[in-house]
Amino acid sequence: MSSGLDPAIAARLKRTPDGLVAAVAQQRGTGEVLMMAWMDDEALHRTLTTRKGTYYSRSRQQYWVKGETSGHTQHVHEVRLDCDGDTVLLVVDQVDGACHTGDRTCFDADVLLAES
């Protein structure tokens, strides 16, 4: 599938063998980490052009826009590429829960280590 992603951006991405990069969503203003999902070039292109968090579902093998069904949308303010080129950071305004469970973040449920 051809993507509309700027070739200069595409050239900087280091993808998995499946052609994906990790995408981390972070709440604007607080820095709270909300979720991690996957993007391919087209999902990143759609995110950059619409300012809506758009991801690629590995299980369904299709694109999804955060909040399209639930109403829990993400308005994207910034997109940053990490130093290795294998992860993008989306700085967003999240409406309601970011997690598909309804929790604010996908990292609320299982604390493996905490301050004692």
Swiss-Prot record:
One of its GO terms (molecular function) is zinc ion binding. Its EC number is 3.5.4.19. Its main location: cytoplasm. GO terms for biological process: L-histidine biosynthetic process. It comes from the Bacteria. It catalyses: 1-(5-phospho-beta-D-ribosyl)-5'-AMP + H2O = 1-(5-phospho-beta-D-ribosyl)-5-[(5-phospho-beta-D-ribosylamino)methylideneamino]imidazole-4-carboxamide. Mg(2+) binds at residues 82, 84, 86. InterPro entries: PRA-CH, PRib_AMP_CycHydrolase_dom, PRib_AMP_CycHydrolase_sf. Its cofactor is Mg(2+); Zn(2+). Pathway: Amino-acid biosynthesis; L-histidine biosynthesis; L-histidine from 5-phospho-alpha-D-ribose 1-diphosphate: step 3/9. It is found in: Cytoplasm. SUPFAM superfamilies: HisI-like. Keywords: Amino-acid biosynthesis, Cytoplasm, Histidine biosynthesis, Hydrolase, Magnesium, Metal-binding, Zinc. Belongs to the PRA-CH family. This is Phosphoribosyl-AMP cyclohydrolase.
